[in-house]
Structure formats: C-alpha cells, structure tokens
Amino acid sequence: MSYYVCVQLVNDVCHEWAERSDLLSLPEGSGLQIGGMLLLLSATAWGIQQIARLLLNR
C-alpha cells in the first residue's frame, strides 16, 4: 500500500508531496545486481559440489 507524505511545508501548507510505500523499496538497478549475486552464489556452490564429488569418489 502506498501513501503520500509532505516533504516541504511552508506556512502550514504543504508545497511538495512524495509517494511512500510499505513494501521493501530497492534503488533503481539493484535487482540485476542482486540477481547476479544469487547466480554467482549458485555457480560457486555447484563448483564446490563438483570438486567434493571428484575428491570423494577416489
């Protein structure tokens, strides 16, 4: 749910409003960065699993 808050008050009259949200808001472009980090984490875990499987099967 979003709502508006006054960000500039002059003589008890609001001159500028800003929209706010109760949801987690991320900065512009951070979604790709987070997705990339999750992909890197998954690839690292897969690589460690492959190395462990290679070493344990000897």
Curated annotation (Swiss-Prot):
It comes from the Viruses. This is 6.4 kDa protein. It comes from Pseudomonas phage Pf3. The lineage of its organism: Viruses, Monodnaviria, Loebvirae, Hofneiviricota, Faserviricetes.
